[in-house]
Each structure stands twice: as C-alpha cells, then as structure tokens.
Amino acid sequence: MACNSPALAAALLCGAFLALPLHSQPLHAQTRPDPAADRLAFQAYFKSRFPKLPLAEFANGPYAVNAEMRKQWESINEFPPYDFALEEGKLAFETPFANGKTYGDCFPDQGIGIRQNYPAFDQATGEVVTLDLAINRCRERNGEKPLPYQTGPMASIAAYMAETSRGKPFAIEIPDDARALEAYEDGKRFFYSRRGQLNFSCASCHVEAAGQRMRGDILAPALGILASFPLYRSDWGGMGTIDRRLTACSAQVRSVPFAPQDRAYRNLEYFLSYMSNGVPIAGPGTRP
C-alpha cells in the first residue's frame, strides 16, 4: 500500500502497519504485537475518512458510503434474494445427522446467535477456526462428509447461523497466547502485502481506495467488510462464502489463490474480524 495519502499518514496507518517484516519472525524477535492498539488506529482512520458514518453502518459495505447504491440495495432487500438460502440453511441445520445429533450439538448455545464470536482461536490446536471450518469439523465428528467451502449447503448453513446473530457486534478475542498473536500478525501482514501481477494488496482497495469506484463497483471499507457474509452477489447469481470472495479477489489481482480455509485465509479473516469488533453482524447480505 502506498503511503502518499495524507489521510492515511494522519491516521498513522502506514507507519504503524507497514513496519512489518516481509517474512514471519518469532514474536520474541519483534516488538510485541498490540492488537488492541491496532484496532483503535484502524477504526479511527475510517471514522476520520467517513466522519458522518456511525460504526454500525460499516456493516453495510459499499451501501454505507454511496447514496445511489444504497437506494438500489434497499429496493432489492424488499424481497431479499438470499431468502432461499436461509430456508435451506435452517432445514439443514435442524436436520439430524445419521447418528441423531445436529449441528447445534457442536456449538455453544446450540449454534444460535454465535456468529459474532468467529473466527476463534483454538488453544488446543493452536490455530484459528472460522465458522465454516467449525461447521465441517462438526460434520466430520458426527460421521458426515465435509461440505465444499465456497457455495451450496455451506453458504446456506452459514447464512442461517449469521441471521440468528444479526445485530450482535463482532466480539473476536485474541488470547494472550504467542500462537494467537502470530496468527493475528500473519493475517495483518497478508492484508497489507502486495501480490499478483497487478501488485495490489487488500489495503490498496479497501483502505486507500475505500468508497471509490473501480470497474463500476464501489470499493467497500475494510472496517466491517466481513459482517454481511455469506453474500448473494449478482455477478455470482447465487450465494457465496468468505472463501469464495477471497478466491475471486485473488483472481482480480492476478494472483494464485490459496485453497479454501487455508491457514493464510483463516488468519486474514481473524485479523479483519478483530479489526471490526463492535460492528454488528448483518449477514446474510447482498452485493452487486
């Protein structure tokens, strides 16, 4: 991400976030990460960039920063195109597995109203667990085959679980565990690192160019960017998960995508979700 933007410089994002090594180092070789300070700076930047926008509105992505698109979005949401996915997801969520158990048996509070707590760091395995990964691990523990991650039943089940959490703010925790801090730093590094033939980073579009138009689309701010997933996108003609969108982003910058639920993507989701703590869940959502 270029650091020639006065607004970015004022928010100290370039200095604070880009002073990162290109390759991972043990935490003892670096200044100890401070995710809370990062989050305050991250949110302060977007609040200064869009001073009239309440924090909760960032959940609505491009519709929060473009009045014309918002009118179209409000019209579409009179008959949400994701309703079919909610119905399918609820049915799948409540249908018992062959052993008689359900998805609810795998999650706190029977899986209702918990989307805002994911991704979570699993101290037993030392890795980040996204909601989608937790759904498939639940299936496997109960003798079922895992679902494909990008669309289909996975998107529908995740959509239903998100809908039960609608309005609850992200509440991602980063425990005082060196492995959790390394996962957070890895996700942060991914977000700010340039890649692909176009030499773009995630931040190039969703920090520096947030709210601007590119190829006919309004670029959503990074703050709250995951709050509305899974999404119904017009260009997909159907539902898609975070993995589907990350794969598409990689293709757009002409970079080789990672496999769905690769550690790199999970850590990126961990970073972005933690940066969005306080932004309410608004999924499932719609996008152009």
Language-model features: where?
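N-terminal secretory signal peptides that target proteins for export/translocation
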Residues: 1-6
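Low-complexity, intrinsically disordered segments with a bias for serine/threonine
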Residues: 8-9, 28
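Bacterial N-terminal signal peptides
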Residues: 9-21
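Sec/Tat signal peptide C-region and signal peptidase I cleavage site
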Residues: 22-29
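Electron-transfer interface patches adjacent to heme c in soluble/periplasmic c-type cytochromes
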Residues: 30-84, 95-156, 163-167, 173, ...
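Long, positively charged binding patches that form subdomain-scale interaction surfaces
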Residues: 185-190
